[in-house]
């Protein structure tokens, strides 16, 4: 009886895993879009005395960009816990055209001009996704 139960349990588990895996396969369109993604991390050091104003501006531009720009998949600002004036922003754009369009939007230009004096340093780090098949699962907008 125990062997029979174990057999059916394993059969059910394998079937569930196979069904679940097939739902996660990327379509050709999704795979093509993933190949065109612009994924970067902005590393920002904020000048002393400007942290609150910078955080508000970063939150504002991130929210407006994701809400209003179809090619902006993610703009996710984060603050480093042990270094509050150190900000990291994960940026994901559908393609280079979406990124270039983002740079021309009124909300980005306002953010850029309004925070120039607040930023001590800025470095943009280009990256490659290691698990592109996870993108549709993580980002519903994708």
List where the protein language model places each region.
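Non-catalytic surface loops within mature trypsin-like serine protease
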Residues: 46-48, 95, 128-130
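An amphipathic, aromatic/His-enriched active-site/gating alpha helix that lines ligand/cofactor pockets
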Residues: 64-74, 92-127
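Glycine-rich beta-strand-turn "strand-cap" elements at beta-sheet edges
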Residues: 20-38, 76-83, 112-142
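Short amphipathic alpha-helical segments
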Residues: 50-72
